[in-house]
């Protein structure tokens, strides 16, 4: 995955090539400006919301689209399967959704000498940095549903960077079937002074990896000399394991 750290509001230029862009933090002005520029072309779009439920299942809904058929929004894959009918295209009016417990995907295809498809995956970031450590195990805050949704989404973002088996990658592959997607063809954009989101891309919060490290470290503390000390090490390991 390419990681682009933004300084002085200088963003990469996306040429006429398909692209999947993960936007961490507030990049709404960039998205709005980009869409304004491509609105001069024939354009079809759909917008998805991703919201975790109380047990952590991701609910994905299409909430906007260029066109409906019999009251149902059609998506970009259907637009392509219909052979790009221009009459279904429309301009896209970007809305500044300020919502930390929802992830949005803007799936846009436009014609500029050739059909170009852009996916913007938009996540504002951690709502409260005091819950940062809960990214390792979001279920520690499951009693606070708003915080739980936000921290679970942060965990999913972290996994897409550090784990081959990513829920978000699986989801994108269902939305984008033109060819198989993996994280290595994605671009992640974050602002240089957005410290919480920078941690998401440079610090691994994977619970299984934490457990493996803790287990290995505590195993190295066990000796053949003292049963009592070994029991203390084991108790400490069990106490820490319960907290992550």
From Swiss-Prot:
It is found in: Virion. It comes from the Viruses. Belongs to the chordopoxvirinae D3 family. Keywords: Late protein, Virion. The keyword Transferase does not apply. One of its GO terms (cellular component) is virion component. Induction: Expressed in the late phase of the viral replicative cycle. Late protein which is part of a large complex required for early virion morphogenesis. This complex participates in the formation of virosomes and the incorporation of virosomal contents into nascent immature virions. InterPro entries: Poxvirus_D3. This is 27 kDa core protein. Its main location: virion.
């Amino acid at each position: 995955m390419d990681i682009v750290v933004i300084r002085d509001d200088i963003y990469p230029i996306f040429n006429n090539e398909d692209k999947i862009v993960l936007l961490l933090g507030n990049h709404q002005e960039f998205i709005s400006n980009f869409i304004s520029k491509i609105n001069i072309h024939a354009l079809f779009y759909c917008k998805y919301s991703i919201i975790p439920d109380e047990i952590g299942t991701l609910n994905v809904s299409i909430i906007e689209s260029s066109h409906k058929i019999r009251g149902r929004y059609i998506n970009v894959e259907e637009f392509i399967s219909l052979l790009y009918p221009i009459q279904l295209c429309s301009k896209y009016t970007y809305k500044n959704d300020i919502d930390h417990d929802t992830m949005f995907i803007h799936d846009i295809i436009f014609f500029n000498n050739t059909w170009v498809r852009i996916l913007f995956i938009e996540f504002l970031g951690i709502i409260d940095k005091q819950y940062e450590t809960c990214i390792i195990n979001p279920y520690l805050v499951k009693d606070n549903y708003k915080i739980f949704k936000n921290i679970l989404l942060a965990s999913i973002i972290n996994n897409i960077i550090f784990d081959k088996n990513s829920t978000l990658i699986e989801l994108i592959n269902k939305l984008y079937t033109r060819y198989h997607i993996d994280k290595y063809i994605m671009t992640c954009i974050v602002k240089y002074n957005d410290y919480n989101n920078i941690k998401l891309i440079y610090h691994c919060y994977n619970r299984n990896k934490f457990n493996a490290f803790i287990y290995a470290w505590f195993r190295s503390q066990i000796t053949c000399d003292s049963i009592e000390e070994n029991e203390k090490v084991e108790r400490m390991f069990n106490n820490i394991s319960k907290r992550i």
